[in-house]
Regions:
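N-terminal accessory segment detector
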Residues: 1-94, 99-119, 127, 131, ...
Length: 168
């Protein structure tokens, strides 16, 4: 993928993406889960983080937590309906997701949400951070959550899947 000046791994002429994409994402997760099981879906998320988001990983590696904060600000600015506060502290970047745009869209349009949907935030972000020495912990989900990013070794405990809510 060619390098761009964008903080995101893609370029778009629109300031905000199309929300109907969330239905396609949910359907993709459902299909992979049905065909390959939970471990197959988690492998997909890890591949997405490692491969598709590789340009972001490079920026994080070069720019540290400042680059992490910049990425998430740009990411959520392009997400329709997102209500997210990104704070960059001395040791952590914290995302307070008050309204997850994907969950809000899927609910508003009567879609059955894949129960493990919110786990993708952990697996994709963890894979993005691997090559940059950045770790993530996710707490909550099902429409709102807290995501904490820090340099590797900062968190004492590994991510607990039970800390990530089941989506409904």
């Amino acid at each position: 993928m060619p390098e761009t000046s964008s903080l995101l791994p893609y370029t778009d002429t629109k300031p905000v993406g199309a929300a109907d994409f969330y239905a396609a994402v949910n359907a993709t997760f459902r299909f992979i889960l049905h065909e390959q099981g939970l471990e197959g879906l988690r492998r997909y998320w890890l591949d997405l983080g490692r491969k598709y988001f590789a340009p972001v990983t490079r920026r994080w590696s070069e720019g540290g937590l400042q680059a992490v904060a910049e990425h998430w600000r740009a990411f959520f600015a392009a997400e329709p309906g997102a209500e997210v506060e990104v704070t960059h502290g001395a040791e952590e970047v914290v995302l307070e997701v008050r309204t997850c745009p994907a969950i809000a869209y899927l609910r508003a349009h009567g879609r059955e949400i894949v129960p493990c949907f919110c786990q993708h935030c952990h697996f994709v972000s963890a894979a993005m951070g691997e090559g940059a020495g950045v770790e993530v912990r996710v707490q909550g989900g099902n429409g709102s959550c807290t995501q904490r990013f820090a340099l590797a070794g900062h968190f004492v405990q590994p991510q607990q899947m039970e800390d990530i809510a089941t989506a409904t």
